[in-house]
């Protein structure tokens, strides 16, 4: 039975519809409980409530908030520009409409939610669903936050809270505990040369896709259904989470763990200029199943020819198939990402990996999905 983890994450960016600027103060006060709730979950880092300075002034004037809510409004006012930039970086966000509004279809980045329905969304925040609680969860936390720092300059509006759910398979857990209301991101290992259904039988990706399709969250091709725009089903760019360990990060591990010299020699045999990789070698990196030293060389060849149109002989594929990343690499990355003598070296190694085109694109794909669903102000304080 596979371990699974979900991160209790932040739902999405919330904005107010322009309709609020044209209603009376009396009508605005009718929303006081909802605004108080939004400010509370913003303080709890469960949502990112984005208001313009004029909207903050209007709410303060019309509604008598308590000290805690006023504190949150002051923070939102002070960081209004930063929040606006965060909204701009997301591909979609929620727009709250006043009570009694007509139903509106999504338009561009905007997904419209009536005030009457807002509590439903607030009570069902999204999560990041992955396999293998401690290892996968910790590594994705590092990849997402570092990717955000590298791509837009700061990870402070992305927050991850781990929650270990036990040993049940990911697909059955999502199906048993959630329904079409599920929000967030599910990331599964590819475990194949192909990234679209049908997935290999009895793999996490196959079981998760079957469950999500039954829940009417994704279609037969694994794409999000329009009825639920705040859920993404993602398949790793390589065979698994291990492929997101770039060559420079792996080289840092080898430099600090001399006992892993045998593994390092294998990578040097396959990539003579390691950790530097040519474009072809970088594509090969994402075609290797680093979890296993018994990968079939034919799978490597199928991935290279099918995904990258690269012709590789059987000898080369056999050499690549014998590579594996030591199990202690992921714990090393997770520990160094927090603190320790290798912390800054790790960040520099990650930045070097981000100069590799295929690696940067793979991280950007996950980071964009995270920005859509996992927005939060991690600098909020409870004073």
PLM regions with names:
Residues 2, 220-222, 382:
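Conserved, well-structured beta-alpha core segment at the onset of a catalytic domain
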Residues 195-207:
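Short, flexible/disordered intra-domain loops and linkers
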Residues 191-197, 224-256, 314-318, 324, ...:
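TOPRIM fold recognition
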Residues 204-328:
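Activity-critical C-terminal alpha-helical subdomain
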Residues 2-107:
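N-terminal extension/subdomain marker
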């Amino acid at each position: 039975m596979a371990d699974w983890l979900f991160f209790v994450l932040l739902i999405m960016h919330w904005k107010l519809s322009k309709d609020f600027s044209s209603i009376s103060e009396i009508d605005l006060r009718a929303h006081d409980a909802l605004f108080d709730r939004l400010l509370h979950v913003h303080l709890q880092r469960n949502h990112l409530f984005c208001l313009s300075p004029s909207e903050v002034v209007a709410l303060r004037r019309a509604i008598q908030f308590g000290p805690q809510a006023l504190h949150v409004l002051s923070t939102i006012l002070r960081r209004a520009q930063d929040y606006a930039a965060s909204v701009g970086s997301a591909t979609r966000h929620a727009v709250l409409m006043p009570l009694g509004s007509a139903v509106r279809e999504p338009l561009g980045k905007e997904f419209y939610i009536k005030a009457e329905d807002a509590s439903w969304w607030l009570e069902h925040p999204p999560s990041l669903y992955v396999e293998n609680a401690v290892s996968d969860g910790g590594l994705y936390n590092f990849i997402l936050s570092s990717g955000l720092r590298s791509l837009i300059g700061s990870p402070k509006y992305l927050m991850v809270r781990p929650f270990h759910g036990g040993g049940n398979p990911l697909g059955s857990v999502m199906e048993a505990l959630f329904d079409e209301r599920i929000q967030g991101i599910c990331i599964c290992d590819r475990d194949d040369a192909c990234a679209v259904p049908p997935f290999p039988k009895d793999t996490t990706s196959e079981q998760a896709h079957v469950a999500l399709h039954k829940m009417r969250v994704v279609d037969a091709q694994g794409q999000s259904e329009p009825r639920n725009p705040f859920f993404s089903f993602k398949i790793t760019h390589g065979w698994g989470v291990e492929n997101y360990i770039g060559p420079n990060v792996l080289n840092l591990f080898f430099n600090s763990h001399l006992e892993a010299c045998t593994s390092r020699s294998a990578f040097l045999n396959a990539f003579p200029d390691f950790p530097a990789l040519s474009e072809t070698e970088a594509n090969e990196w994402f075609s290797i199943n680093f979890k296993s030293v018994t990968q079939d060389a034919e799978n490597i060849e199928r991935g290279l020819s099918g995904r990258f149109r690269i012709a590789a002989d059987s000898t080369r594929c056999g050499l690549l198939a014998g590579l594996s990343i030591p199990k202690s690499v992921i714990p090393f990355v997770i520990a160094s990402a927090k603190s320790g003598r290798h912390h800054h070296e790790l960040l520099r190694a990650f930045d070097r990996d981000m100069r590799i085109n295929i690696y940067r694109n793979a991280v950007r794909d996950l980071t964009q999905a995270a920005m859509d669903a996992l927005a939060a102000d991690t600098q909020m304080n409870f004073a």
